[in-house]
Design a protein with these regions (language model features):
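Compositionally biased, low-complexity linear motifs
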Residues: 5, 152-155, 342-345
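Post-cleavage N-terminal segment of exported redox proteins
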Residues: 1-62, 153, 161-232, 236, ...
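Periplasmic c-type cytochrome electron-transfer domains
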Residues: 100-205, 326-335, 393-398
């Protein structure tokens, strides 16, 4: 089960580490990602304008182009707001899309920051699922990741790739698109769509706004600033395997090569987050989002031990988030941290009780998958009436530390 693999998986990740991820990212950039077509034939060379290649500059325009949606009012930037760490700027559990912007989604919007070193999905030597994009790791490149938002009925809601290209032909930058990818590129909708994917991928890889590494914590690691007393206490609790133990999944130290910490090990965990009635789909009691084994991901549906596991996100910019976890159940960072340490000591705080007053713990999972939830690792290895791994004041300190992971810190 996933919860038994944490100690092993970190040793595995430290071995393969960031060099593997960086090599994978570089290789994908060279071959144009996995968007299909012959994207490798498109040269990607830097230009002086903003330091972006011509392909990435196109990607920047596409990223903010609302006309490529069925509503004409939604772009990538609508849900991934650059002014909020490329994440949602409201506190809705899920966003609304579709032709009339009234179709609810199924998962909270993740940030697009610090995704450029994400490796393609694989199983580590100990069997730990690792990497991939989206909360279930079902696609292997940033290029592949960009397809569904254009076509999903609850997002930009185009009915086909060809429909996206019809809209692209009316865009102000269409001639630039032809100049970069060839005069006849729009003659084949699949080829043209593949170039859209490539452009979006390159924009996210090349533009340092997606990975600036300029938080207070980055500057602290570089010896440029100091953390205050509460932040230092929070860092110690974050790293302490007997207290917060956050570092078990959210790596906080520089890599052996001096690389900045990404605050994720790219693995998956099953936390048993409460069911969120704010998501319209949950009105159907038969609906369950099982992460690695469905409903969006289908290739692992028979791997019952994986059901309920979601990808460990980076904690960079977590203090800017408006909702937390895959279903957006929690609205504040303090609530989210408190859930980690009181989920098992005080489950009544988070889960409903049945008619007999019995708390329905892990109520967003079918009964047969509740055994998959991580209950062996600190801070989850507690029982009711035991003290939580962190006191309320210690939770406050961890929250203070997490605030140091926000990009764009300016020393006073």
């Amino acid at each position: 089960m996933l919860q038994n693999n944490h100690e092993v998986r970190i040793r595995v990740w430290e071995k393969i580490g960031l060099p593997l991820a960086f090599a994978a990212a570089s290789m994908l950039a060279a071959c144009g990602g996995g968007g299909g077509g012959d994207t490798a034939s498109t040269p990607i060379t830097p230009v002086a304008d903003g330091g972006l290649s011509k392909v990435a500059s196109l990607g920047k325009k596409i990223f903010s182009d609302q006309s490529l949606s069925a509503s004409g009012k939604q772009s990538c930037a609508t849900c991934h707001n650059p002014d909020n760490a490329h994440a949602q700027s409201n506190d809705l559990a899920v966003q609304l899309g579709g032709a009339n912007l009234d179709v609810p989604g199924f998962r909270a919007v993740p940030s697009l920051r610090y995704l450029n070193l994400t490796p393609a999905f694989f199983f580590a030597s100990d069997g730990t699922p690792t990497g991939g994009f989206n909360r279930d790791g079902r696609v292997n490149t940033l290029a592949d990741q960009s397809e569904r938002p254009f076509l999903a009925p609850h997002e930009m809601a185009n009915d086909s790739r060809a429909n996206v290209i019809v809209k692209l032909k009316q865009a102000a930058y269409v001639e630039e698109f032809r100049q970069v990818f060839g005069a006849s590129i729009l003659d084949n909708s699949d080829d043209a769509f593949n170039r859209i994917q490539l452009a979006l991928q390159q924009y996210q890889k090349e533009d340092t706004d997606f990975h600036p590494y300029d938080s207070k914590y980055d500057q602290f690691l570089a010896g440029k600033v100091s953390l205050d007393a509460a932040e230092l206490r929070g860092l110690a609790l974050f790293n302490n395997p007997a207290k917060g133990n956050c570092v078990a999944c959210h790596l906080s130290a520089k890599g052996s090569d001096g690389s900045s910490p990404l605050f994720t090990d790219f693995t998956f965990d099953n936390l048993g987050v409460p069911r969120n009635p704010a998501i319209a789909a949950t009105a159907d009691p038969a609906y369950h989002d099982l992460g690695l084994c469905g409903p969006d991901r289908t290739d692992l549906s028979s791997r019952s031990a994986l059901c309920g596991a979601f990808k460990v996100p980076t904690l960079r910019n977590v203090a800017t988030r408006k909702v937390f976890f895959h279903n957006g159940y929690f609205k504040t960072l303090r609530e989210a941290v408190s859930f980690y340490v009181k989920r098992d000591t005080n489950p009544e705080l988070w889960y409903p009780a049945d008619a007999n007053g019995v708390v329905q713990k892990f109520n967003d999972l079918p009964e047969q998958y509740r055994k998959n939830v991580n209950v062996t690792e600190v801070p989850y290895n507690r029982q009711p009436n035991m003290p939580p791994a962190l006191s309320d004041s210690e939770v406050d300190d961890v929250v203070q530390f997490l605030g140091t992971l926000t990009d764009g810190y300016k020393a006073q």
